[in-house]
Amino acid sequence: MREAVLVQMTWPGAPTIYYGDEAGVCGFTDPDNRRTYPWGKEDKELIQFHKDMIHVHKTCQELLTGSLKHVVSDYNVIGYGRFNKDAQTLVVVNNNDSPMIKEVSVWELGVPRECAMEQLILTTKDGFTTKKTQFPVVSGRIVINLPPKSGIVLRHVNKQQGKKFLHFE
């Protein structure tokens, strides 16, 4: 579920959350297409993940109006960049049952050939983190190592724009 939310909040267009998705409500087909909201039994971690991803979406201008470029395409793996003149965001999702390591060309997104990209969020099958981690970019490429059923959002802000921090509450 978190992988889908990660893509939804970083893909072009206005993300839509259908009633109860943020709390883990599921359904099938009509008339069981949407069950009642699970008051008192919500998936609080999933709600927090939605809040954090909405914060990323609203705070990163390149996610609102930036360009899109596919940078990774493999079986059950997708990677793309969202970018503008000020910042670049890289999104990679591994929907496989096994870990993956990919070397990704990020210079095509406008990321400098020698710098670092900052992890904004990492989701795995066991949970998620907003812990800031630096990923080195060497010769315009970055190495992404993802566990099974996971996704990551990395960001670089151009120096002339100053460092813009995302603060999670």
Which role does the model predict for each range below?
Residues 22-25, 85-87, 95-98, 151, ...:
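Short, solvent-exposed loop/turn segments at secondary-structure junctions
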Residues 5-8, 25, 75-84, 143:
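Short, surface-exposed beta-strand/loop micro-motifs that present aromatic residues
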Residues 71-111:
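Carbohydrate-binding surface patches
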Residues 133-169:
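C-terminal beta-strand-rich structural cap/linker in extracellular carbohydrate-active enzymes
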Residues 37-73, 153:
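Aromatic- and carboxylate-lined catalytic core of secreted/periplasmic carbohydrate-active enzymes
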Residues 5-44:
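Aromatic/acidic polysaccharide-binding cleft in carbohydrate-active enzymes
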